[in-house]
Amino acid sequence: MICCVEVRLTIPDNEARTALSTLRRLGVSVERLERADLYRFDVEKDAEKDLVATLRGFETVYNPNKHALRVREEERPGAGEVWVDEIDGAEVRSGGAVRIGGRALPGVRSMERFTAWKLMCATGAAVPERVVLEATETLLCNPAFQKATRK
């Protein structure tokens, strides 16, 4: 079973602000930009609930003072989104337990980590796919060592 978990800052995100400012200066038509860490897990049946509780206890992944954590319904990027990960080593598969920060994730067969970018217009609606592509190629993904997954 695939389980996607999003961890988003609840405090101001300076990286997203800087990226938004840069995209605007480069002429990309985007009004709002949000960033989140996204983990896509292949978990054993009935392990999702325990996984979320485990992640909430990992301070290297989730700090309740500055993060919001949610399980996403979708296994792929939605409208206005791009997920960026490194070409080499983004997916962790293990004969033993998959680990984050040295700590085991029981019931997890594999894990992928992405940076999820959501691009929006002034109303909060997703920007058109052509704008996502332009932002991805212009700034959000460096094809020398990263790959982008779009809708």
Predicted regions and their residues:
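Core nucleic-acid recognition elements
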Residues: 1-151
